[in-house]
C-alpha cells in the first residue's frame, strides 16, 4: 500500500477502496495508529495480520526503528522479541533473523541482557 493513509482522517480512510480488504481487527489497528498520528502506511498492508500490525504500532509509538522487524516473514511473537530488544538498546542484528523462532530470540535477548548487566 502506498502512503495514501498519511493525512487522512478515519472517516476518509474508511471510504478508500483498499481499506475494505482488512478485517475488523486490522482496521482497528489502523484506526488507532491514525488517532495516535503514526505513519500507518508502514503496517497497513494485507500481508500483516492484526497481531503483527499491533507489534509494529507499538514500536512506532515508542519511536523505534521498526524497519528491522516490519516484515511479513516475522510472526508477531518474533516481532515482539525484536521490539523488546530495540527497547532494551541491544544489538538486534544478532537475532533478527526469520530462521530463529521467538523462543530462541527470547533466550538470546536474555543472555544479552545478562551480559549487559554484568558490564555495568
Question: Which stretches of residues belong to each language-model region?
Answer:
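General marker for long, soluble alpha-helical cores
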Residues: 1-120
Amino acid at each position: 500500500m502506498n502512503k495514501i493513509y498519511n493525512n487522512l482522517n478515519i472517516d476518509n480512510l474508511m471510504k478508500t477502496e483498499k481499506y475494505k480488504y482488512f478485517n475488523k481487527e486490522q482496521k482497528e489497528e489502523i484506526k488507532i495508529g491514525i488517532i495516535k498520528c503514526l505513519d500507518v502506511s508502514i503496517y497497513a498492508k494485507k500481508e500483516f495480520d492484526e497481531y503483527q500490525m499491533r507489534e509494529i504500532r507499538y514500536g512506532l509509538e515508542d519511536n523505534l526503528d521498526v524497519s528491522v522487524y516490519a516484515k511479513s516473514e516475522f510472526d508477531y511473537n518474533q516481532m515482539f522479541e525484536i521490539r523488546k530488544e530495540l527497547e532494551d538498546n541491544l544489538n538486534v542484528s544478532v537475532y533478527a533473523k526469520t530462521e530463529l523462532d521467538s523462543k530462541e530470540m527470547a533466550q538470546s535477548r536474555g543472555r544479552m541482557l545478562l551480559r549487559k548487566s554484568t558490564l555495568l
